[in-house]
Amino acid sequence: MTVQNLAAQSPFITKDGSTIRSILDRTNAPVQKQSLAEARVPAGGRTERHYHKVLEEFYFILEGAGEIELDGERRMVGPGDAILIPSGTWHTIKATEPLRFLCCCAPPYSHEDTYLE
């Protein structure tokens, strides 16, 4: 059985500029097909516009508000919103207030599959 606590995970900055704490991924669990992380973007901040060739992502907004952009389409998001980001989709999220969200990736997240504009 694998149980990880968010508070025990060290934060790091991803290639897109967000602050991440991996909850379950290949570095801390016997994960094969997906990963789960908490992401934070400060008010006024945004992730670098990017896409992933292989992985598909879900974002689930826990706190804050912002604007998600997927292939040029924009929408305001807030707590309780779940966002599907298909493989190959250019995306960025801008925080209009401090954002905290869960990010689930399948297959597991890797810097090598993140392509910046």
Residue ranges of each PLM-predicted region?
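A cytosolic small-molecule/anion-sensing beta-strand core signal
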Residues: L62, G78-P79, E97
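A generic "binding-loop/recognition-motif" signal
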Residues: A43, V54, E73, T89, ...
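Histidine-centered metal-chelating micro-motifs
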Residues: R46-E48, E67, I83, S87-T92
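A short, N-terminal "cap"/entry segment at the start of jelly-roll beta-barrel domains
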Residues: M1-K33, E48, T114-E117
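Ligand-binding loop in jelly-roll beta-barrel domains
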Residues: S87-E112
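Glycine- and acidic-residue-biased ligand/ion/polar-headgroup-sensing regions
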Residues: V54-E56, F60-G66
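Short acidic-glycine-tyrosine-enriched beta hairpin
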Residues: E73-S87
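Conserved short histidine dyad/triad with adjacent acidic residue
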Residues: A37-H52
